Amino acid sequence: MPPKPRIALIAHDHKKDDIVAFAARHRAFLSQCELLATGTTGGRLIDEVGLDVTRMLSGPWGGDLQIGAQLAEGRVSAVVFLRDPMTPQPHEPDINALVRACDVHNVPCATNVASAELLLAGLARENGAAQAG
């Protein structure tokens, strides 16, 4: 049996409600995975969805970079990063570095809910789990 997927969950402020709703819909599958998240997102997933999440720093304080470092070490299976394309982010270079690391290391990265749905369905199929959702 393959190892548990280790999934990073990240969301910009205007997308936090979306990632909480997404995680709630997929709670059964996500609870079978190892999860890590940036600080505020992780706190909401713990408090509102009841998931076990390893929290990094908040994104603007280096959380995206912490996740990127683990990804570069081969310790992240997939990234769900719900980005807000309409709001400038003060830590945009960190965000670009994380997405680039996904590309360099061939780690799937979903940046909107539609692609995140497909990503989880693929992980569930690959890991023989019940369909995500």
UniProtKB/Swiss-Prot annotation:
The active site is at D64. GO terms for molecular function: methylglyoxal synthase activity. Pfam families: MGS. InterPro entries: Methylgl_synth, Methylglyoxal_synth_AS, MGS-like_dom, MGS-like_dom_sf. Substrate binds at H12, K16, T38, G39, T40, T41, S58, G59, H91. GO terms for biological process: methylglyoxal biosynthetic process. It catalyses: dihydroxyacetone phosphate = methylglyoxal + phosphate. Keywords: Lyase. Residues 1-133 form the MGS-like domain. Catalyzes the formation of methylglyoxal from dihydroxyacetone phosphate. Belongs to the methylglyoxal synthase family. This is Methylglyoxal synthase. It comes from Cupriavidus taiwanensis (strain DSM 17343 / BCRC 17206 / CCUG 44338 / CIP 107171 / LMG 19424 / R1).
